[in-house]
Amino acid sequence: AYHSLIILFMVFILVTSEAIPFPAIALLALVLQVLLGVAPADVIASSFMNDAVLFVMGSLMFAIAIVHQGLDIRLAKIIISIFGKSKRLFLAGLMVVSAVLSSFLGEHTIIAIMLPIGLAIIKNVDSSTPDGKNAILLVLFSIAYGTIIGSIGTPSGGARNVIMINYLQEFTDTERIDYWGWIQYAYPILIIQLVVAYFVLQFAFPTSLDNVQVQGYKRSIAKSNSATNIRHLFSCLIIGLIITSWFLFNQELGLGIIALCGVLIFMICGMVPWEVINKNTNWGVILLFAATISLGFQINETGASSWLVERFNELTSSFPEDSSFSWSFMAILTGLTSNFFTSSATTSLLGPMAIELQPNDISFGMSAAIASGFSFLTVVSSPTAMILYSTGLVSIKIFFRVGLLMFSSSILILYLVSKFYWVTL
């Protein structure tokens, strides 16, 4: 068991320091599990590839296929037609649409589609004035926070959600949470977070929005041809089919296989070539997810997670048994760790410990997975944060300053919902 904890500590140091490439970290974690006698090679190999890993691979490929269709213009027209009556309503619409789509298709997909819309409407804003700078930040953060918040909403919103579902199925005797069950737990948190985020951003970036060109952008995208319309329509049908299948067949087929079916449809219909998918798929990330999931399984199987929980309980023995200290510690720990270590890897490695704290209470595992999606503090915490920072318009200091308030609010929202709403499910 202690060998698995040594590997866990080593992986954490290597990922946070980026001392070696991610694929090398993944392979090293796999090899060391065998060399240090954590488990036989066949056992390690079987835990390396499961539905959670297939989902990570399938969702990344599916995202590439969707972005390749150029749906950003089509989506912009829909948003403007619904929310275009005022600029602040439009920003609220950007956030809501980003969140809803991100909850089903993943934040890495939606930030790639939505960010060009935001950049287009702020291209003429003068960033040298405080009002103009705040307008730029308000638009960009509205999209970014929408995609980050939305990723907790459904199992397909993020790999960490699927990982936790697998862990709950493997390590507990509770009834398995399906696609709709996860939505019942997570979507109320998502909705409250959106409302809080809107007012947090309005407070953090006060601006008149004078130079934000919503109507000008509407005129620039007014023209489109019928061939593009047909392609977009067919793409939407494929997306709808996959989302419906996640709802109806997630237990029979698995989320990963369904995601891969979507990729196959796009390729078979000639809508995206394999070369594009192969070139843009981050295979190193897939390997790292697989390795950390495998390590997470072994941490539980070897009893390492039970040992950690026993040590934790000894440290907190002075607290009342019915206190929420354990829950708060686990939620804050996973939330903070994910801001430096990626949410999926955090859930893979700390998820077994969260479940072990209360094996018969899924709120501990669910809270850990959801809290790991609160990627508000650092620009390396999520694909959305990294893409936002890469624009050169958002500084690390600003991201942290606004994110600290949003992170604290999100932990409080999660606690209140789990305390008063989850108990009714």
Question: Where are the model-predicted features located?
Answer:
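Hydrophobic transmembrane alpha-helices of multi-pass small-molecule transporters
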Residues: 1-55, 170, 181-310, 405-411, ...
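Hydrophobic alpha-helical transmembrane segments
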Residues: 5-9, 24-27, 88-96, 110, ...
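C-terminal ends of transmembrane helices
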Residues: 10-17, 64-82, 267-276, 335-336, ...
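Transmembrane alpha-helix interface/packing and boundary motifs in multi-pass membrane proteins
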Residues: 13-20, 97-106, 145-155, 245-250, ...
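Membrane-embedded alpha-helical segments and adjacent helix-loop junctions characteristic
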Residues: 24, 28-130, 284-285, 289-358
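Alpha-helical transmembrane segments
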Residues: 51-61, 103-113, 182-198, 363-373
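Alpha-helical transmembrane segments of multi-pass membrane proteins
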Residues: 56, 87-100, 128-150, 177-185, ...
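Membrane-core helix-loop-helix motifs of multi-pass transport proteins
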Residues: 125-206, 364, 387-418
